[in-house]
């Protein structure tokens, strides 16, 4: 009954002028994806000679895989782009868009030296569509802070 009275008390009249435009919002990043994942020390598998270790991570099914794939490893409080060399140990990665599998490899730069099992590590993957990357040609993709700022990444 109260609703009926509220609608009945409204009068049809002329439409007023449009209000002012709102402020311009921040540049979005809807098409740039970023996620963090861990590889535990128990997930690393050595090759038969013990010269190289590998581990895999499968991206979530909802991940859009078109574009550039950039991988960073947490190094103290910073993110270092792969490939990355630390104390003679090289970290590099391969990405297969068909399976959405990121494979991380760790090996001694001298290629003939056995290395110990890598520790647990935290990685960040950033996927940037080609059109978005072309709009930002001066971004140093090897510098995560620059990537984060340019593409408005929250993490």
Feature locations, PLM:
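C-terminal partner/receptor-binding element of secreted or periplasmic proteins
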Residues: 119-155
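C-terminal motif of bacterial Sec signal peptides marking the signal peptidase cleavage site
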Residues: 6-9
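Extracellular attachment/recognition segments
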Residues: 39-118, 155
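Disulfide-bonded cysteine-rich modules in secreted/extracellular proteins
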Residues: 29-42, 134-138
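Sec-dependent N-terminal signal peptides
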Residues: 1-4
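Collagen/collagen-like triple-helix recognition
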Residues: 13-34
